[in-house]
Amino acid sequence: MYYTNKETFVLSADGCMDTERGGLESILAGNDEGAKGCCFSVAMSADGIAVLSSDGCAAAPDGTRLPVSDYSYAELHQAAPQLTPVSQAIELARTCQGKIAITVHDQTMLRQLRMTLRYADCLDDTIIIGLGLVEAARVASANPDLHIMGELPNLPSEIDALVNAAQTTGLFGLRA
């Protein structure tokens, strides 16, 4: 992904413009309003299927919240038919020709995401966010084909040292 500090691009957020969180509508709404890509969060089902989920849960029509990691994809889809596999979101984002920022909270899903992104030819247009600085650096070192951004809990006082450390570990960027 080509990026400089002079290039600005706006990504649509999950649930933007009063769309439902964890769905495809925010990708379309953002694209319609001129966003240059989209952001979404993923969670992994008990049988290893990555799905859109902003909080790690799937919402059943009756309002029940089901932890995604506790159920198989089939069980989740039966209880929450609107549940979206991440592959559908990636394909939609690809057709919108924008950048993708995927929030992951567990690095175990990176293997599946990498395969899905590579298959959709979106690997170079995707940033993985949501991992702490140390974990992100470790993941970036082991996965040089992924653009990993490290999360900072707060802005440190030694900015130059931090930027240098991020560059030497292979991080795509930092986010505070």
List each language-model region with its residue ranges.
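Phosphate-group recognition and catalysis centered on beta-loop-alpha active-site segments
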Residues: 1-176
